[in-house]
């Protein structure tokens, strides 16, 4: 499949999801892996999605902050919220893949502090009338006037995926939604998100916090059909899509190495075994099965891991479009209605 063909398929996915009542369409920002990173510009994704959907909310999950000047993020976000007519969800991330940073001459060491600074700047930029001045640890501005302001006031909903306790404390205080990946053991991080929820409520925000959970999903008519189809797609995903990188490293094994370096043996163990579908299914780390089974899996995982937003990856590996669209349709018609009334917190 060429990049152009993949984009056309993506638009067909989004149209189907919009018609079925999906809430969000997010994109990650990845770079420099021809097998996988075909959407290096979240802003372009949002622009394309805006003209093809009517109800879904879209956004980056998120802009890799150290690769940008914060003013650029604020300007892009303001324009996108207008293009989307108030449907932007603005995600910011610090970035975890060192490969992205070198060609951009970006600061990997201070990435977390840069992301936190950008969060403060964006909120101030969108709430300031007239010229803006800002004094941050990395960026300083005097008399900057944004020519476009977002439709949503005071700003679009903000997201920052994190499992760091100190960062989560900041996000709860600032009213920023969060989330994490299936590679992170749910039972290990649940206490941190419980504290995040407590702090959010204590801060008195008028909205409810969203905690997202990124996970691979395949739904078919029966469990046996789903597992049989998913096995090949998952294998291709983790050996080809997240497979050999430019430096010769194997994607999922390098993820395991990164988790180990950060002192996270639980994440390293999941990453090392991600290529094994049986391992994932036994631990409920992939939602594969009939609509009834997938519904039960999601509810159990959400109760354990304290998430209320499923960031589902349906386009897995080299999945056939017929299977992809069937999975999306079954999820939208039979799983989604069952989840509407389910509240894990």
Give residue spans per PLM region.
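N-terminal beta1-alpha1-beta2 module of alpha/beta enzyme domains
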Residues: 1-52, 56-57, 153-156
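Glycine-rich, proline-tolerant flexible connector loops at the mouths of alpha/beta enzymes
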Residues: 24-48, 64, 96, 184-186, ...
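Flexible, glycine-rich active-site loops centered on histidine and acidic residues
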Residues: 1-5, 66-134, 178, 184-186, ...
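Hydrophobic faces of well-ordered beta-strands that scaffold small-molecule active sites
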Residues: 25-27, 58-60, 88-92, 158-161, ...
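Active-site mouth loops of central-metabolism enzymes
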Residues: 1-7, 63-71, 152-162, 218-220, ...
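Acidic (Asp/Glu)-rich catalytic clusters
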Residues: 18-19, 46-54, 77, 81-87, ...
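An alpha-helical appendage that flanks or caps ligand/catalytic pockets
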Residues: 109-147, 187-307, 340-345
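Conserved, mostly hydrophobic/aromatic
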Residues: 29, 49, 80, 122, ...
């Amino acid at each position: 499949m060429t990049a152009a063909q993949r984009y056309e398929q993506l638009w067909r996915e989004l149209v189907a999801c919009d018609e079925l009542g999906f809430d969000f369409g997010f994109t990650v920002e990845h770079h420099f892996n021809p097998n996988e990173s075909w959407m290096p510009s979240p802003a372009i994704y949002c622009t394309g999605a805006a003209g093809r959907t009517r109800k879904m909310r879209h956004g980056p999950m998120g802009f890799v902050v150290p690769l940008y000047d914060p003013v650029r993020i604020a300007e892009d976000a303001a324009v996108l919220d207008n293009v989307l007519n108030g449907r932007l969800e603005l995600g910011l991330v610090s970035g975890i893949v060192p490969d992205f940073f070198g060609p951009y001459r970006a600061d990997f060491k201070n990435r977390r502090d840069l992301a936190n600074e950008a969060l403060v700047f964006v909120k101030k930029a969108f709430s300031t009338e007239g010229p803006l001045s800002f004094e941050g640890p990395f960026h300083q501005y005097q008399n900057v006037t944004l020519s476009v302001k977002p439709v949503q006031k005071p700003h679009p909903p903000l997201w920052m995926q994190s499992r760091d306790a100190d960062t989560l404390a900041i996000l709860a205080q600032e009213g920023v939604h969060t989330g994490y990946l299936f590679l992170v053991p749910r039972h290990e991080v649940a206490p941190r998100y419980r504290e995040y929820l407590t702090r959010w409520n204590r801060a008195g925000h008028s909205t409810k916090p969203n905690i997202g959970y990124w996970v691979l999903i395949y739904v078919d008519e029966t469990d046996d059909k789903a597992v049989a189809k998913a096995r090949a797609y998952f294998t291709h995903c983790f050996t080809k899509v997240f497979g050999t990188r430019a430096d010769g490293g194997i994607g999922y094994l390098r993820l395991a190495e990164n988790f180990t370096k950060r002192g996270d043996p639980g994440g390293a163990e999941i990453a090392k075994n991600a290529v094994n579908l049986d391992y994932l299914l036994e631990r409920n780390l992939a939602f594969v099965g009939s609509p009834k089974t997938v519904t039960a899996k999601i509810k159990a995982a959400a109760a354990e891991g304290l998430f209320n937003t499923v960031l589902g990856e349906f386009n897995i590996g080299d999945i056939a479009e017929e299977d992809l669209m069937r999975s999306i349709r079954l999820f939208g018609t039979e799983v989604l209605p069952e989840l509407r009334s389910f509240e894990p917190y």
